[in-house]
Amino acid sequence: MRLVVIAVGRLKQGPERELADRYRGRFADIGRNLGFRGLDVHEVAESRARDAGQRIREEAAAVLALAPKEMILVALDEKGKSIDSAAFAEHLGRWRDESVADAVFMIGGADGLSPELRRRARLSVAFGAATWPHQMVRVMLLEQIYRAATILAGHPYHRG
């Protein structure tokens, strides 16, 4: 299974980019041995439309244009379900074992995700009740993907 992160907004050079790259690299090392075909990250430019609804629609169209046709969509959304790392790993492991080709994780921009993307998501995940900037959500998601791989591999990184 290939994992794909599609994020509205760009990570500039700096600590967030360094952390994102670090977790992505760590996942590449362990994920391959677990049957994962990679972890791709695509960035979508933030819409410049004046109207928030129009921005959300434009960003949703850009996200869907990058998403594979056959996939499981996972929304990173403040209204999503809070799940622990072990449950997150269970989802990834189950989808891999079911021969799902692609699992796509969507991170919205400042206005969030469109209602259409929320409806299409198989799973909606929140990293707690707080609202996070998309840069931090991306780093936290990549860390959780890496952590999930270590859980599936029985690696000592996760000591939960």
UniProtKB/Swiss-Prot annotation:
InterPro entries: Alpha/beta_knot_MTases, RlmH-like, tRNA_m1G_MTases_N. GO terms for molecular function: rRNA (pseudouridine-N3-)-methyltransferase activity. It comes from the Bacteria. Keywords: Cytoplasm, Methyltransferase, rRNA processing, S-adenosyl-L-methionine, Transferase. It catalyses: pseudouridine(1915) in 23S rRNA + S-adenosyl-L-methionine = N(3)-methylpseudouridine(1915) in 23S rRNA + S-adenosyl-L-homocysteine + H(+). Coiled coil: none annotated. It is found in: Cytoplasm. S-adenosyl-L-methionine binds at L76, G108. Signal peptide: none annotated. HAMAP family: 23SrRNA_methyltr_H. Belongs to the RNA methyltransferase RlmH family. PANTHER family: METHYLTRANSFERASE, RIBOSOMAL RNA LARGE SUBUNIT METHYLTRANSFERASE H. Specifically methylates the pseudouridine at position 1915 (m3Psi1915) in 23S rRNA. This is Ribosomal RNA large subunit methyltransferase H. It comes from Nitrobacter winogradskyi (strain ATCC 25391 / DSM 10237 / CIP 104748 / NCIMB 11846 / Nb-255).
